[in-house]
């Protein structure tokens, strides 16, 4: 399935365009080292996961050369729209890949069919869960085995001040790079605080706010908002990140507190 700017569709057409193989490159872990005179070996200075490739192979069937040309032209329009988009495939139905097409090649050509190989770069170096944490958790098409989901009742809406937020992905969620939306409601006389004890991150909203008066504080990626209006000047300008696994969260200086945590898991 393809998701191009919200338009979701299957590029396959029965007896005409058929995906016959999906190959995903293994994670690429790049490590750089520094060497110091007089010491043994090298010291790791930098390490990161690098972009990898996703390759889809299609068979196309046609009646003649004119029919073939029409199909190939149509596939050019589909696969190379000129912007990044998401690909989901049946081998990992609970994950999606944000891709850029980099190669479109006819690898085999016959009188009535051809084989086309399309290579995509995955620049983020990760896949992400098809659904966000505020969707229901069950092993349907949106969630699958191998997504680090245990037999547990995962919650991402809370009405207590101390709780755990579980990040089932392989990577930390950093709002400077990834979508993370936190909403905070309740009654505060000032200095309402979100504290992640696991990472040490602390976000503070200094003024009073009251949900009884219709006010909600939101952290939408890197943007603090009060009822949708940017309010970063009234904060400590810090962010909340989520480490892989369990994050111990504490909400301070807010009575009758309610909070929600919406994000996607990220996988190697």
Regions found by a protein language model. Name each.
Residues 1-51, 93-105:
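Solvent-exposed edge beta-strands and adjacent loop segments
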Residues 2-4, 121-126, 134-142:
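Mixed-charge, glycine-accented linear interaction segment located at domain edges/termini
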Residues 8, 63-103:
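Short, acidic/charged, Gly/Pro-enriched secondary-structure junctions
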Residues 41-66, 112-126, 247:
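Oligomerization/assembly interface segments of phage tail-like spikes and tubes
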Residues 48-52, 79-81, 110-114, 174-176, ...:
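Solvent-exposed loop and beta-edge segments used for protein-protein assembly and interaction
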Residues 69-76, 115-117, 132-137:
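"Short basic amphipathic alpha-helical interaction patches in structured regions
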Residues 84-128:
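Short beta-strand and beta-hairpin "edge-sheet" elements
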Residues 135-268:
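Intrinsically disordered, low-complexity segments enriched in serine, threonine, and glycine
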């Amino acid at each position: 399935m393809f998701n191009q700017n919200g338009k979701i569709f299957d590029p396959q057409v029965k007896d005409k365009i058929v995906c016959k193989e999906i190959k995903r490159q293994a994670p690429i872990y790049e490590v750089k080292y520094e060497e110091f005179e007089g010491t043994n070996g090298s010291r790791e200075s930098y390490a990161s996961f690098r972009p990898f490739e996703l390759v889809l192979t299609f068979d196309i069937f046609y009646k003649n050369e004119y029919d073939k040309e029409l199909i190939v032209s149509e596939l050019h329009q589909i696969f190379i729209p000129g912007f990044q988009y998401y690909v989901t495939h049946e081998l990992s139905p609970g994950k999606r890949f944000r891709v850029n097409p980099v190669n479109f090649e006819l690898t085999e050509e016959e009188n009535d069919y051809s084989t086309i190989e399309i290579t995509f770069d995955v620049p983020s170096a990760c896949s992400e869960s098809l659904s966000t944490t505020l969707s229901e958790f069950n092993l349907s098409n949106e969630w699958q085995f191998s997504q680090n989901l245990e037999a547990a009742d995962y919650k991402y809406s809370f009405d207590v001040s101390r709780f755990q937020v579980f990040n089932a992905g392989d990577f930390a969620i950093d709002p400077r790079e990834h979508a993370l939306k936190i909403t905070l409601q309740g009654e505060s006389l000032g200095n309402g605080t979100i504290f992640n004890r696991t990472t040490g991150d602390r976000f503070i909203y200094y003024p009073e706010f009251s949900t009884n008066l219709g006010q909600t504080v939101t952290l939408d990626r890197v943007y603090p908002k009060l009822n949708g209006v940017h309010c970063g000047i009234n904060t400590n300008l810090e962010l909340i990140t989520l480490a892989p696994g369990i994050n111990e969260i504490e909400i301070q200086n807010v009575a009758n507190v309610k909070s929600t945590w919406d994000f996607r898991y990220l996988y190697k």
